[in-house]
Structure formats: structure tokens, C-alpha cells
């Protein structure tokens, strides 16, 4: 029975009082931003409303491990004293003194139905309308185009259920105070349209959507200086429907107008979108029916905030989002509970984050983030935390931050985690304060992943950052092929890769480089390439470190680790064992710290290995092999201790047989350096970046389709392949491969075709032998007998020809049917750039013609192909050459001026000329052929046309009579024709003879 309103919340925790802010839920309170509370504390809620304290008798008791962060809690009805329904507090007097053409409402407390107002049924375009109080839209209504709608103090528009409101090129704005909202009821619809776009500004909740409402906005729509631009809270019904949108601007430029109640204060635009309980919110879109530039969230405190919702974000830019004014601020995208996908693509529609405090936050849910660009990030780029059994995929993002890059914290156990192919660069403007600056931070609770967890192919650069890849209480992860570059001016003790309390992990083929000077003093705080602390059962293979004090630093208990095949260049120590805090232990106790390790490696530094204690028990059951001297151990090899040996002969000194080698690239028939560079996005093609990058990506994608074995166990190529499989590029390559496969006979068809070919060859041999016998016959009886035998062979050959013709007819029909299906798929493709548009167009013509056995082009197809063929191949891609090849089916003289395209000269549109086809000119295709010809007479025949087929000696072999009334004809060639050249002849009505040379393949 509470009234709706904003209820301040006071709660007590650990003896101190705190105040949290809530939104206008009914009997529901949203806690957010509350962390690190003492265990087993009791929360006593006091709701301040109408100057009265309502005390709930400890309705919430939180136990150890429970979190308040962004969670919904419902107040038990039995614990709250009910209040009688109160009338809504009167709005202060209206004060909007603008000149207007039409006014709706008499004062700021009035409620007016549209159908009884002065603006119904219509008003002239360009009108100025003032709304006082509440306007109920109780009929479908199109606001006059280019009109301005001024909203008086606390005014609002309510679109009633069953009706639609359309704003086209309108501006909705406040006068001196904020106005409430355009509230869209269940079953109501709101449309924002226009050529220059509709602008909505100065609203509290500019568009407030109810369950079951529908909202559509076109490109160029602008939301300016609203507290929240689009607002939705699930009330328990079907969610609102926000239709796909692009090119929409959400912007904050200045402090907000004063709140209409005179009490509440909103200092700045809080969020572009705020939703709670939405089953699938899509921000941005990739579909063909949505045009426009990226959505932009600029100058707000947050871009997109979502709670208990599944969210997808495409084609959006987040800029200048600062951590001011509110408890939650500075987020590009923040989702708490639910899931978040920011998939992007390699070539377009990725999300950008510029000058934001934080890029993306996901709390307790699945996360997929790909191909984002982040620059000027103050805190972190991507963070996912406080979840379990979730899928986390962070791939191919480019992050530039001043503090942290990628964070996964308290997500144990993950179902599957992939952090791969990201570029992270951190430049600290000031010296490290809390030591938490890191490129990738992984913190867990020692629960291994359900499926797998890999951190691979990342390129990480840090200046004055203590940690490159930091792992704390992480078990069962694989780190491979990462490149970490560290430097320092204020931070000495950086670690390229650091494992703390983390067991059963593998580190393979990672590279760490630093800027250590070899005369620096060594201690725990000095730079180390890789360090292990209290981390057991580790597998380290084929890693390389350079220019650090310690190549590999091992401290405390690191038992039963396999440390092998490393290269430590320009280091004070290749391997450094540091056992602080264990002096005075008995030998057996000390032996448990570092026993059972095996290490093979090489370095060019000062010492091969250093052990802080020469007592043999520290390294019992351990073996260390190095390839050559000088590789002196410290303590020295006295007695000798037996744990440190020079040995050039051991096969373990190379990576050839290592576990990591199986995860790498190359090797015989496998992919090479170019494929690797393309998959990583490291190719710099120069001038035509987009075109060449697209072409290389399509080529590598095609290779992977032909070599699925390259994907096995290789996360780099698997991620690259998956990232393109659902894009238009991947679909085009797949269609091209399927189109090529149309001309590959199935095993069954190949057997049939081979059978008939062998039979024909055999029969031709028999006929040749019979012809020789016939020429040598000395009597009429012999000739008669041979001719009879020859006739029987010819009849059998005719039977085989008919059977073979039937087989080929079925093959060609199946090919045409399959081509038609591919044509339908091709038509559904949505090209994202000129290369894809060209490829789609050429593919369409190919599937309409050659793939269906048609070897002629109509005028529309010629126009389509010529538009592609006339482009510069550098910008139009390989489809330009494919179009030119198809145009050879036409009588077209082609001169495309590629010399100008290749040089620096200004591109000149090529000149193309079409040869005028004589209306009596007959075209023959395919040529060469095997069994059939198709003819195009060039026009519908007005009279019968007779065709004659001759061999080159002038012997008439076949005659066809083509009836009038048709233009296209199918001809079956005589079955006994051998391979070679023949003449097809006909006579024009004028009496002139025309001939075509036809080639037959046997």
C-alpha cells in the first residue's frame, strides 16, 4: 500500500549507519555499490516517507558470503506497517513562459486526453506546443512534423494501451525544470522518426517503458541532458520490445535542469539506457533493415546499465564517461546478473570506448566481448566477477588503460574461459600506489574450470606496472603464446607472469621481455620474467624471458613442478630459488618445499641458477640440466651437489617433443607465418588496409575450411574461424566453396561416368578394328559380316549414349537445383562493405548462369557484372576479376584501365563498349562441349531455321530444323562423334551463310 516514490534508505551495518539510494520500485529495494561488509551483520531498514519513520523489525539478515552488490530484495509484507493510500502531492505551479501556438492542460496538475485537446486531430507542421500536467494519448497520433513540444514543470505524456504516438523531426524539451517522461503503457507504441531526427531533452525518464510496450527509433534520434534517456523496470509481465536501432545519440553536455519537485537533485545525465529484468535487450543492430552510423553514448555518467537482464550490444561508441556524481558512474556497459554479449566483427560494427573510467563490467553472468577498441580508459577495460559456472570469452580486444586491462575475479569455477588475441597497453601516469596495476588479473578460489580455461596469444605492454599476468588461487588454466613487455622507472619489482597459490597450471611458449640493467642488485623486489610462489604441480615449457633480473623466480612451496626448455637471455639469474621465511626448519620439512622439480634451459646471463640455501634438502629429488658452460650455479658446484649438471646431449633441451609444440603453428603441411599473422591481425597491408585485410582473412578462412585439422587443439585458429563463421565474409566464402563443389561429381556419379567413358573407349577400339577389317575384306560375304557386326556395335553404342545422356541429365538437374538453393542463400546475405557487395553480386550471376548450365548473359546480368568489373581491383577485391571472367560470355569489348589504378594517376572510369549483336547472329554454348549444345538465336524466330553439322572434311553429320516462335534451343550431338573440331552452319533469310566452329571433347 506504499505510494510510489523515491525512498531514501538508511541501514545499519557493523555499528555504522549508511545511506543508499533506491529507485521507484514498489515494495522492492535495489542495493548497489555495497561491498566488503562485515560478516553476520543485521540490516535494519528505516523508510523515510512523508516525514514519518516506518521501522521494519530486522527484515534482512545477511550471513557470511552473501553480497548486497546490485541485488534485488523484496520487503516482507508482514514486517511493514501499512499506510493508507495517499493522494499524489500537488505539483508546484507552472512557470513556462514561452510563446506557443497550442497549449495542452490548464495547470501542472491537470490531466488531459489527447482526443479532447487543442492539438487533436492535427495541427500544422512547425507548430510550438506547450504541455502542462499530463497528456494521455488515447488515439493513434502523429505529432506535426518539425514541431517543438515544450514540457512545463513535471509534465508528462502517457501513451495509453492500444495506441501509438509518432514523433517525426520533433523536439521535446523542458522549460525551466525537468519534466517526467513519455510513459508507454502495456500494449502502447512509441515511434521516433524523421529526416533530421527527433530530439528529446531535459526529461527525468525521457522514455519510460512499461511491460508489453513497443518502442522504435530511427537513426539521428537524439537524447540530450536527460537523467535517464530510456528506462525500463520489469513489473512481472512480458518485457517491453525495443526494436533494433542504429545511429542514435545519447549525450550529456551540461548540468541538468532543477528537479520538478524542488527537492530531488540530479546533477548530471545518469545513463543512456537503464533496464532491469529484460530477457533480451539489443543495443544496436547488424541486420539489413537498420541503417545509420554507430549509436553513441557521450558525456553521460554511464552508457548502458542493466540488472538481471540479458544484453547484446553492437555498433556503439561510448565516450567521455566520468566517475562523478553517483555511486555507479564511469561505466560504458555494466550488467549485473544475466549475460552480456558485445560480439562485434573484425571489419565493422565493433564497439568503441574512448575516455571512459571503465569499459565493460559483468557481474555474475556469461560474458562475450570481441573486437572492441578501448582508449583513454582510467580504471579497467573489461571486468567480470562474482559468478560461477559461467562462460567467459574475451577475444581480440584492443585496450589502452592507465590502471588495469582485463580482470576475472571470483568466478570459480568457470564453465569455460577464453582470453585470447587481446592487445593491452597500460601506461601509469604516476607511480604505483596499491600495487594492483596489472595487464591481466585472474583471481579465484582454486576451483578448476568445468571445461577449460585458456589465456593465449595476448600482446601485453606495461610501463611501471607491477604485474603483467597475475594469477592468484587459480587452478587448471593454460597460458600459452602470450607476449609480455614490461618496463620501469618507478617500479622495480615487476613480474611478467606471476602465479600465487595457483596449482596445476601450464605455461607454454610465452615470451616476457623487460628493461633490467644487469648491474642492478637482486632481491625479491627485482624484475622477474616468470615467478611462482606457493604454486605446485606446474608445467612450464618453452617459455622465453629476456632482460630481467630473474628469468624464473621460484619461492616457497613449489613441489612437483615440471620446468623445462626455457631460454633466459640477458638475466642475472636464469633460475632463482628464493626461500624466505623457511630458515630454521628441519631438513625433512625444508625438503617439501622444492622437491621433485625438473628443469632444462639455457641463458646468456651472469649465472645459470641461484639457490638461496645450499642445503641439499631444499632441492631434493630435483634435477637441473643446462646445455653448456659457463652456466655456473650459485651456490657453486662444490662436491658437486648433484642437482645442477652441464649436459649438451639431452633431447629435453629443445621444444621439439614438448607438450607446447603441439599447440604451436607451422610444421610441414600446417599453416605458416602468414596464416598466423592474419589470424592474429598483425598484418599491415599498407594503403588498402580494409580491402587487403578482408582478402587475407577470407583466404585464411577458406584454408581452414579445407584443413579442419589445423583447428584441432589450436585455440588461435579456432577463435579466428569462429569469429568469422557467422559474418557475411564467412558466409560468402562458404557459398563460394559450395558453388565450386557443384562441379565435383559424387563418388557414385563418378563411377557411372567413368564406366560409360571406358565402355565408349572400348567400343571405339572395336569399331576401329572392324573398320580395318572392312578395308581389308576380299569378298562381299566378309564385308556383309563385318558390317553386320559393326552395326551391332553401333546400336550398343547408341544404347550406352542414351544411358549416359540420362545420367548426365540427372547430374545437371541436381546441380541446377543445388545452385538455386545457394542462390536463395546468397540473396539473404547482408554485405558489410564494397568487397562483400561485389562478391555477392558476382556470385549471384554465376549461380544464375554457369552453375545452372546457362552460358549466356541477359542485359541485367551484364549491367551488374560491368559495375563490378569496372572497379579498381585494389579496392573492389578479387570479385573484380571474377566479374570480368563472366563477362566473356557476352559480346563485350573490355578495357578497364588498370594501369591508372595501379599507379598514382587519378583513377579514370574505364570505357566499356558493347558490340551490337546482329539479330540473326546465333550464339553457341558451351564450347567446347561433350554431348549437348545450347543455342541462342538472338531473337524469336519468325520462320524455321535449318542447322547443318559438318566435319572438317565437309561430310554432313547431322541436320536440325529449328521451329519458329522460339529463341533458345537444346541440341543433342550425334553419339558417334569423336573428339575434335566441327562446323555448325546455317543460312540467313538473305541467303548469306554463317558458320560456327564447335569443339567436342571425348
What are these language model-derived features?
Residues 99, 240, 255-259, 594-902:
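Extracytoplasmic/secretory-pathway proteins
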Residues 943, 967, 978-984:
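A glycine-anchored, Pro-Gly-centered beta-turn/N-cap motif
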Residues 39, 979-1002:
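C-terminal tail/sorting-segment detector
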Residues 120-123, 141-151, 165-179, 193-205, ...:
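Beta-strand-rich solenoid/repeat architectures in extracellular/passenger domains
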Residues 89, 96, 896-925, 940:
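Residue-level detector of functionally pivotal "anchor" positions at catalytic/ligand-binding pockets or at interdomain
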Residues 911-939, 949-956, 999-1002:
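Surface-exposed, proline-anchored Ser/Thr-rich loop/turn motifs
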Residues 74, 79-171, 905-907:
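N-terminal domain-start segments of secreted/luminal proteins
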Amino acid at each position: 500500500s506504499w505510494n510510489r516514490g523515491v525512498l531514501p534508505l538508511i541501514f545499519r551495518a557493523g555499528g555504522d549507519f549508511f545511506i543508499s539510494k533506491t529507485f521507484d520500485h514498489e515494495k522492492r529495494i535495489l542495493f548497489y555499490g555495497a561491498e566488503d561488509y562485515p560478516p553476520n551483520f543485521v540490516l535494519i531498514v528505516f523508510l523515510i516517507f512523508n516525514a514519518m519513520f516506518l521501522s521494519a523489525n530486522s527484515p534482512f539478515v545477511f550471513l557470511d558470503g552473501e553480497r548486497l552488490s546490485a541485488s534485488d530484495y523484496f520487503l516482507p509484507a508482514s514486517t511493514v506497517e501499512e499506510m493508507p493510500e495517499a493522494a499524489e502531492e500537488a505539483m508546484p505551479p507552472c512557470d513556462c513562459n514561452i510563446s506557443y501556438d497550442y497549449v495542452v492542460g490548464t495547470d501542472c496538475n491537470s490531466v488531459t486526453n489527447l482526443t479532447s485537446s487543442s492539438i487533436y486531430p492535427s495541427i500544422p507542421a512547425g507548430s510550438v506546443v506547450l504541455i502542462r500536467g499530463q497528456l494521455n494519448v488515447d488515439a493513434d497520433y502523429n505529432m506535426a512534423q518539425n514541431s517543438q513540444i515544450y514540457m512545463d514543470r513535471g509534465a508528462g505524456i502517457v501513451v495509453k494501451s492500444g495506441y501509438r504516438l509518432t514523433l517525426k523531426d520533433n523536439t521535446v524539451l523542458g522549460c525551466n525544470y525537468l519534466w517526467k517522461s513519455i510513459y508507454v503503457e502495456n500494449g502502447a507504441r512509441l515511434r521516433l522518426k524523421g529526416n533530421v531526427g527527433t530530439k528529446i531533452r531535459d526529461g527525468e525518464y525521457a522514455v519510460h517503458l512499461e511491460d508489453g510496450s513497443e518502442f522504435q527509433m530511427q537513426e539521428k534520434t537524439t537524447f540530450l541532458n536527460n537523467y535517464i534517456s530510456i528506462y525500463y523496470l520489469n513489473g512481472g509481465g512480458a518485457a517491453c520490445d525495443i526494436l533494433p536501432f542504429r545511429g542514435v545519440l545519447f549525450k550529456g553536455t551540461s548540468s541538468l535542469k532543477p528537479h520538478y519537485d524542488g527537492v530531488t537533485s540530479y546533477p548530471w545525465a545518469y545513463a543512456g539506457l537503464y533496464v532491469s529484468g529484460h530477457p533480451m535487450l539489443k543495443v544496436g543492430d547488424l541486420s539489413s533493415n537498420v541503417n545509420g552510423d554507430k549509436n553513441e553514448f557521450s558525456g553521460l555518467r554511464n552508457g548502458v546499465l542493466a540488472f538481471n537482464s540479458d544484453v547484446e550490444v553492437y555498433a556503439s561508441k561510448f565516450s567521455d564517461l566520468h566517475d562523478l556524481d553517483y555511486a555507479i558512474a564511469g561505466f560504458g556497459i555494466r550488467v549485473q546478473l544475466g549475460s552480456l554479449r558485445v560480439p562485434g566483427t573484425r571489419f565493422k560494427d565493433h564497439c568503441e570506448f574512448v575516455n571512459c573510467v571503465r569499459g565493460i563490467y559483468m557481474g555474475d553472468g556469461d560474458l562475450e566481448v570481441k573486437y572492441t577498441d578501448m582508449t583513454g580508459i582510467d580504471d579497467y577495460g573489461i571486468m567480470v566477477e562474482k559468478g560461477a559456472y559461467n562462460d567467459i570469452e574475451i577475444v581480440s580486444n584492443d585496450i589502452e588503460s592507465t590502471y588495469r586491462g582485463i580482470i576475472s575475479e571470483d568466478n570459480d569455477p568457470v564453465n569455460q574461459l577464453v582470453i585470447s588475441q587481446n592487445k593491452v597497453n597500460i601506461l601509469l601516469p604516476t607511480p604505483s600506489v596499491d600495487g594492483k596495476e596489472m595487464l591481466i588479473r585472474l583471481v579465484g578460489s582454486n576451483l578448476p574450470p568445468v571445461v577449460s580455461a585458456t589465456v593465449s596469444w595476448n600482446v601485453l605492454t606495461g610501463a611501471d606496472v607491477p604485474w603483467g599476468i597475475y594469477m592468484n588461487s587459480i587452478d587448471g588454466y593454460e597460458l600459452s603464446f602470450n607476449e609480455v613487455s614490461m618496463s620501469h622507472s618507478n617500479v622495480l619489482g615487476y613480474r611478467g607472469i606471476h602465479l600465487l597459490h595457483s596449482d596445476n597450471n601450464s605455461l607454454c611458449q610465452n615470451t616476457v621481455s623487460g628493461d633490467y640493467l644487469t648491474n642492478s642488485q637482486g632481491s625479491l623486489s627485482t624484475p622477474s620474467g616468470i615467478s611462482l610462489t606457493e604454486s605446485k604441480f606446474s608445467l612450464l615449457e618453452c617459455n622465453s624471458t629476456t632482460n630481467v633480473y630473474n628469468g624464473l623466480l621460484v619461492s616457497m612451496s613449489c613441489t612437483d613442478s615440471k620446468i623445462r626448455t626455457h631460454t633466459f637471455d640477458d638475466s642475472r639469474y636464469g633460475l632463482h630459488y628464493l626461500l624466505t621465511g623457511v630458515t630454521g626448519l628441519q631438513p625433512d620439512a625444508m625438503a617439501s618445499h622444492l622437491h621433485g622439480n625438473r628443469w632444462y634451459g639455457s641463458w646468456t646471463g651472469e649465472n645459470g641458477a641461484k639457490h638461496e640455501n645450499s642445503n641439499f634438502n631444499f632441492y631434493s629429488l630435483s634435477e637441473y640440466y643446462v646445455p653448456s658452460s659457463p652456466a655456473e650455479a650459485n651456490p657453486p658446484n662444490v662436491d658437486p651437489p648433484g642437482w645442477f649438471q652441464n649436459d649438451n646431449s639431452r633431447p629435453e633441451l629443445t621444444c621439439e617433443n614438448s607438450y607446447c609444440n603441439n599447440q604451436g603453428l607451422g610444421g610441414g603441411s600446417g599453416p605458416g607465418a602468414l596464416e598466423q599473422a592474419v589470424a592474429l591481425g598483425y598484418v599491415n597491408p599498407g594503403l588498402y588496409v580494409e580491402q587487403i585485410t578482408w582478402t587475407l582473412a577470407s583466404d585464411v578462412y577458406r584454408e581452414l575450411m579445407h584443413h579442419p585439422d589445423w583447428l584441432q587443439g589450436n585455440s588461435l585458429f579456432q577463435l579466428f574461424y569462429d569469429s568469422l563463421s557467422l559474418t557475411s565474409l564467412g558466409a560468402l566464402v562458404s557459398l563460394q566453396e559450395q558453388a565450386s563443389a557443384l562441379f565435383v561429381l559424387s563418388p557414385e556419379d563418378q563411377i557411372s561416368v567413368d564406366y560409360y567413358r571406358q565402355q565408349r573407349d572400348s567400343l571405339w577400339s572395336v569399331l576401329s578394328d572392324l573398320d580395318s577389317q572392312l578395308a581389308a575384306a576380299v569378298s562381299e560375304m566378309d564385308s556383309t559380316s563385318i558390317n553386320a557386326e559393326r552395326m551391332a556395335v553401333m546400336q550398343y553404342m547408341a544404347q550406352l549414349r542414351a544411358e549416359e545422356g540420362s545420367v548426365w541429365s540427372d547430374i545437371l538437374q541436381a546441380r541446377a537445383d543445388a545452385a538455386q538453393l545457394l542462390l536463395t542463400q546468397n540473396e539473404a546475405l547482408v554485405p558489410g562493405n564494397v568487397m562483400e557487395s561485389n562478391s555477392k553480386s558476382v556470385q549471384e550471376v554465376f549461380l544464375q548462369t554457369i552453375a545452372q548450365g546457362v552460358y549466356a548473359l541477359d542485359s541485367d546480368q551484364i549491367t551488374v557484372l560491368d559495375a563490378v568489373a569496372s572497379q579498381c581491383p585494389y579496392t573492389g577485391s578479387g570479385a573484380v576479376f571474377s566479374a570480368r571472367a563472366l563477362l566473356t560470355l557476352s559480346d563485350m569489348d573490355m578495357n578497364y584501365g588498370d594501369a591508372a589504378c595501379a599507379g598514382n594517376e587519378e583513377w579514370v572510369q574505364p570505357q566499356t563498349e558493347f558490340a551490337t549483336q546482329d539479330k540473326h547472329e546465333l550464339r553457341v554454348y558451351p564450347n567446347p562441349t561433350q554431348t549437348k549444345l545450347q543455342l541462342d538465336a538472338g531473337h524469336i524466330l519468325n520462320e524455321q531455321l535449318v542447322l547443318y553439322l559438318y566435319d572438317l572434311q565437309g561430310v554432313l553429320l547431322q541436320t536440325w530444323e529449328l521451329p519458329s516462335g522460339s529463341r533458345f534451343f537444346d541440341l543433342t550431338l550425334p553419339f558417334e562423334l569423336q573428339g575434335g573440331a566441327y562446323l555448325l552452319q546455317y543460312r540467313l533469310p538473305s541467303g548469306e551463310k554463317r558458320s560456327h566452329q564447335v569443339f567436342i571433347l571425348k
